[in-house]
Design a protein with these regions (language model features):
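Intrinsic disorder/low-complexity segments
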Residues: 1-46
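Catalytic-core signal marking the mid-to-C-terminal active-site face
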Residues: 48-62, 301-402
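Acidic, glycine/proline-rich low-complexity segments that act as flexible tails and inter-domain linkers
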Residues: 48-59, 64-83, 88-89, 96-114, ...
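Active-site cofactor/substrate anionic-group-binding motifs, chiefly glycine-
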Residues: 98-152
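A generic, well-ordered mixed alpha/beta core segment in the N-terminal half of proteins
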Residues: 128-221
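Phosphate/diphosphate-binding glycine-rich loops and adjacent basic-rich segments that engage nucleotide
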Residues: 198-267
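Small-residue-enriched flexible segments
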Residues: 237-301, 310, 315
Length: 402
């Protein structure tokens, strides 16, 4: 199914709670013509209209499908819709390893009682500026969504809201949650303990660390926000899994085996481990983020981390942190955003190295992907499409349009 290009609005709003509170806004509310859309795509070195893909779906069709599937395994409809929106927002932004790709895995865990479909997500203890949230083994998207709301409310009162999370689950891309405070003119920060250990300590071979991601979201006035979303490994493990599904090889530098030899076949990933960014520096960051998101909150870290790719039944006790900073406590909001615009343009317009077409800032590529896929739909390889159709048949729900 190919979705025709059309005018679209540069606004993406997620309602976290049932009352429909706006907690995320991406870009500025302005129409983008087809001409402008093509200009943006060219800046990415790609004409989306000619990009080859097996299937392409409108985001609303995918959201509806995910909602049907999650409702079929016991999630209340309103909560299934929240999870579906976040999962497909991941796909819209190009995080293909964290979107609908994960649905079969989530369904398996729910059916095996590895996740709680009726969790009592609650605050364990709190102060004016901090809180600890217990997710009761609920879906990570719901747990972190709840926690982001708490952080935003606390930042509104105290200037900062730091919320630690325990007994959560895999929640998708870090950027989704770091961006939630943007709608309140706040800066967002998110950290997490990954849902499986794929890295050893620097110089070791025992898998004691995950890809422990961090994300920052900083609003701008006219430019899209700065959104830095990075794993502490060179590549997130979700990218390895999507490479394997597509039958593609991995670049040298993503993984090595126990003897230090490059590993490029994603189907042999179990024979090696991911490499950290910046060598020992990435190892140090993964360790610190794990202590802040895991150990500090009473969540799993190190040997206690459950590999949710292999174990569908055991509670993962995943730990996360969401932080909101109220810009107005430090600087006039509009002046700050204008200064961010200036910094973005200074970076983008600086002198380029020979052969470099464009200097980008963090989040620019994901924002362009969001524009592209909002216009022409989300691509899907045939293997994933068939997996999802089989899942629909197993659950007794309508599948994707073919």
């Amino acid at each position: 199914v190919r979705v025709k290009s059309q005018r679209t609005t540069l606004t993406s709003i997620l309602s976290l709670q049932k009352e429909g509170e706006e907690v995320i806004r991406e870009g500025s509310a302005q129409d983008v013509s087809k001409k402008d859309f093509r200009r943006i795509v060219r800046l990415r070195g790609l004409m989306a209209e000619t990009q080859l893909t097996d299937h392409r779906f409108h985001s609303k069709d995918l959201e509806a499908f995910v909602t049907r599937a999650l409702t079929a395994v016991g999630l209340p409809a309103s909560e299934a819709e929240q999870v579906a929106h976040l999962m497909i927002l991941a796909d819209l932004r190009g995080s293909d390893g964290h979107g609908i790709f994960r649905l079969p895995q989530y369904v398996r865990r729910i059916k095996a009682s590895g996740m709680n479909v009726r969790p009592n997500i609650h605050i364990v203890q709190e102060t004016e500026a901090a809180a600890l949230v217990d997710g009761d083994n609920g879906m990570g998207h719901l747990v972190v969504g709840f926690s982001a709301k708490v952080a935003i409310e606390k930042a509104g009162r105290a200037g900062i809201g730091w919320v630690g999370v325990r007994r959560s689950n895999h929640a998708g891309p870090a950027a989704l949650y770091a961006m939630m405070p943007l709608a309140r003119d706040m800066i967002g920060i998110y950290m997490a303990v990954g849902s499986a250990n794929h890295m050893p300590p620097w110089g070791g071979i025992e898998l004691l660390l995950s890809t422990n991601p961090i994300a920052f979201a900083i609003p701008a006035l006219e430019e899209p926000p700065i959104v830095l979303d990075i794993a502490t490994s060179v590549a997130a493990y979700g990218k390895v899994k999507t490479k394997a599904q597509r039958g593609e090889g991995m670049p040298i530098g993503w993984m090595i085996d126990a003897f230090g030899r490059p590993l490029t076949d994603p189907k042999r990933a179990e024979e090696g481990f991911l490499l950290p960014i910046g060598d020992y520096k990435g190892y140090g960051l993964a360790l610190v983020f794990g202590l802040l998101a895991g150990t500090l909150n009473g969540a799993a870290f190190g040997r206690d981390v459950i590999d949710f790719n292999k174990d569908d039944t055991t509670s993962t006790n995943t730990g996360q942190v969401i932080v909101a900073l109220d810009i107005a406590r430090f600087s006039p909001v509009e002046a700050f955003k204008r200064n961010v615009d200036e910094v973005i343009r200074e970076m983008r317009n600086s002198q380029r190295m020979h052969g470099v077409e464009r200097i980008r800032v963090p989040g620019e590529r994901s924002h362009a992907t969001w524009l592209e896929r909002s216009n022409i739909g989300i691509p899907m390889n045939d293997t994933l499409f068939k997996d999802l159709q089989r899942l629909a048949a197993d659950l007794g729900v309508d599948g994707l349009p073919s």
